[in-house]
Amino acid sequence: MSVRITDIWRAFQGLVPSIIATADGRGMPNVTYVSQVYLVDERHVALSCQFFNKTRRNLDDNPVACAEVVDPLTLQAYRLRLKFLRSEKSGPLFDTMSLRIDAIASQTGMTGIFRLIAADVFEVVSAEMVQGFLTDPPPDVRSGISLDGARTEMRGLQLVSERINRANDLESLLACVLQALEEFFAFSHTSVLLWDEQNRRVTTMASRGYGESGVGAEVALGDGVIGTVARERRLIRLTSLEADLRYGRAIRRESAAGERALEAEIPLPGLKDAQSMLAIPLTVGDRLVGVIAAEDRDPMRFSEWHEAYLEIIANQIALGIDRMIERGDEAADAGVPADTVPLPATSAAGSRMIEACRSKRRLTYYRNDDAIFVDDEYLIRNIPARILWKVLGEQQRTGRTEFSNREMRVDSSLGLPPVKDNFESRLILLRHRLQQKCPDLQIVSTGRGRFALRADAAIELVER
C-alpha cells in the first residue's frame, strides 16, 4: 500500500535505525544501517554522508537505492525506492543536517572528526507499507495533534505571553516561564541560559526539574548541544538522543586508537537518561540573549510542531529579557550615588557581641582563578565573585550593608564590560549560589537598583 512520506514523519526521526541498500555497477549488493533518513519535503529525502564509503561509491556507479524506515510507535516498516540526485556540501539543507551532527560531535568530544561530509539528496520514486510486517497498530496511536489539543496549546501560548508581560523583574520572568511550560505543556525538565559576552559562555539562570544544582552551570560557546545552538543561533531538536551519543562514542573509541588527540567529553546538561532534547536560541535581532532548552525521557516528546511553537515563546522570552536589561540599566542610573553610605545598624561593640554568638564561615578569594570558595567548597567565579568580594570587603571595613547597582557599574575593579551588561542576571546568579552553598549569607533586593548584604554568620575573608 502506497503512503505519503510526510504522513509517516515519525519514521524519519532516527529513533529506529534505517537500512539502505545499494548495488555497484556489476549488481553486487551492499546493505548497511544509517542513523537517520532526513525528510526534506513530500518528494525528497536525504542521507548524511559521513563514513559510508561503499554506499557512496555504489551510488556513483548506480544511482538507485532502497531504504527501509520504521515508525518507532507502531513499529510498522516502510520501504522507499530512491533515485540519487545530487550531493550537497553547502546550503540550507547541508547546514541543517550538519548542525545536528556537530552538536552530537561536540557532546562526545568528536568535534572535527565526527562530521558531515555531504548531504546526499534522493527523489522518492515510491513509498509503501511493508505488508505483513506487523499486526494492526494499536488504536490509540495518533499521527498528529488533535484540534482540541491544538486549541489547548494555543491557550497555553496566550497564558505564557501574559506571564512574561506581567513579570516585574528578570528572576520572576524566568521562573514564571518555566513554570508555565510545565503547567500547560508538561515540559517538566527545562532551563534558561543567558549569554555572557565577556566570558563567551551561556550560564544557567533558571531551571525546572533538575533541582538547585543546575543554576550556575556554564556552557562555552560551541560546546555540546546548547553551546552549538548558542554559536550557530539555530534551533536543534534531537530524538533518540542516547543512540546518537552512543554512536558518537563508538566512533570516538575507534579514533582514540590512533595518534590523534581528542578533547575531553562534555557531560550532557540535565537528565542523564534524556532521550529527546529541544534547544532554541534566544535572540533579539542578530544579538544573542541566551538559550532555552527542554529535555524528556520520551524519545518522541518533541515534534516539528513543538519547534515552531517554542520558537514563538523563545522570541517573547528574548524580548522580555531584553526589556528587563533595559529596565536594569535605568534602575542602575536611578540608584543611590556611590558615596551614599548608610550607617551600620548597631554599634561596633554590639556587632562584636553578635559576631561571637554566630556560626563562622570562611570565604577565600583566589585571585589567579577569579573564584571564591566557601569553607573550601567552590562558590562562584568571574564578575559575580568580584561583586561579592567587593561588598564583603566594604562591609568588614565600614559596616556598610547596602549598595547600588550604579556604584557597581562604575567601579573599574569589577571589570564590567563598557557596553550594555545584564548586571541583574549576575546578582541573580550570585543570590542562587549563596542559597545553595552558603545560606548564612544573602543578597537581598531593597528597591529599584539597590541590594543589601545580609549575614547570619561571622564571615572570615581570606585572599590568596
Regions found by a protein language model. Give the residues of each.
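DNA-recognition element of transcription regulators
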Residues: 380-388, 416-437
